[in-house]
Amino acid sequence: MSSEIAVIILAAGKGKRMSSDIPKVLHKLKGTTLIERVIKTSRKLHCKKIITVIGHQKELVKQSLIEYKDVTFAIQNEQKGTAHAVKMCFENLENFDGNVLILSGDVPLISSKTLEKLIKAKENTGAKASVLTADIDDPIGYGRIIRNSSGSLNQIKEHKDCNQEQLLINEINAGIYVIESESLLEYIPKIGNQNAQGEYYLPDLINLLVLDNFSVELHKTEQIIEISGVNSQEQLRELELYSK
């Protein structure tokens, strides 16, 4: 892989459904916190930067990662969405030119192998970005991948913004992206929050690229467990069955 890689890990959320006093990303899976698992996977990609976005109980998260000297932090004090979280990383990305891989701190089983394929999907096609997708039986809550007649991406639409026809789509956005750094810095400020949640969505960056006729590559994975997030204690217990 020719271009340098910077990794952004989104870890600022409260995780209300965990019903716990500690931040969601500090819950442990087989003895290792969720955020540490994502950092260790990122390291396997030989990335130049690992930027972790923190917010809720930020000092606790920061302290837990004190031994990870290669990790820098960006602060998202207000939870205004994933695009807003990435915007908080602009200072950390100063003078960086390459691919930015965006991960979630609560998706602990993603593998470096899958991420390498996603990066190659962008690099090999000359696309501005690549998006990880998957076909799942129960797509409730996930953003949908809407393709055009030729099979290319038309748009990504959040579940709450989908019409009845779009809700029947089973191909979902896994929330993992590779984006050219120049495009990231240019398009993040263009994102609005005219949606059901009133938030700044990262998928809208992808949609803006498509609207401007730039190529976005879709990489579909069959490793469904790898893209499973932790939003509750029940989901955490479920992932215990699959983790090493």
Predicted regions and their residues:
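Left-handed beta-helix
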Residues: 1-4, 197-244
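Conserved N-terminal catalytic core of the sugar/cofactor nucleotidyltransferase
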Residues: 2-3, 32-103, 109-113
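Structural beta-sheet core signal
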Residues: 7-9, 51-52, 101-102, 129-132, ...
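Residue-level signal for inorganic ion chemistry
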Residues: 9, 35, 50, 89, ...
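Short glycine-enriched, charge-decorated loop/helix-capping segments at active-site entrances
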Residues: 22-28, 191-194
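Short aromatic/basic micro-patch
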Residues: 28, 109, 178, 229-230
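Conserved core of the sugar-phosphate nucleotidyltransferase
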Residues: 69, 110-196, 205, 214, ...
